Amino acid sequence: AIREFLQANARLDSTIAQVASSRSEVIRVSAFASMAMHWLPSIIRRFREERPDVDVDIRMADHIRSPYELLAQGKMDVIFVSHQEEESGYEWIHLRDDTMYAVLPKDYPIDGRTGHPLSEFDGRDFIMPAQGFDKDIMRIFNRVGVKPHILPTAVDDPTVISMVEHGLGVSMMTELTLRGRGDGVLLVPVEPKSARELGMAVRAGEGRQ
């Protein structure tokens, strides 16, 4: 795992240097909110070390597909997202797997378990997180044949957590998204262990210039 991290870090540094060297004024970056909050400050510092004369324009992603679309249209130079195999025309740098957690009310009967079976989501009121998480989450549910009752909501992550806290349903979020949150709810890793793959993407050929 350490070797994989070091290799990913080396590839990240190399790609940042290559993208930075090919831009004359602005490097355009799109990222999920959780990645922007926890990772982008250090990554932007790397860009500035490579090219202090180039500005970094950061845009928050409001859905899984939008960063890929912006990248394909040439409106973004770099995106930090979850891996979507059906998308094409980009080079992918894996950074880490982001573990999925069940988000449950405090009074949920977990009976001392250290993991939450995915099967227990079946038929339950489910509050879908923000940022188009549905693709990553539904891929996991479909893999095990689970069909929760997805509530018609379009709210941000803190609101999802608050709704769960007040007993309005359950949810599933990742470790990175939940960092520093969740005091009013139970956070239990799902079983079987599931994760979304997070990384950096550039247009095909961009990382080799």
Predicted features and spans:
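Alpha-to-beta junction loops
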Residues: V54, L71-F80, M100, V146, ...
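A ligand-binding cleft/hinge motif common to bilobed small-molecule-binding domains
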Residues: S82-G89, R139, R143, D157-V185
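Central regulatory/effector-binding core of bacterial HTH transcription factors
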Residues: S24-S88, A154
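Secondary-structure junction motif
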Residues: S82, I110, R124-V144, Q209
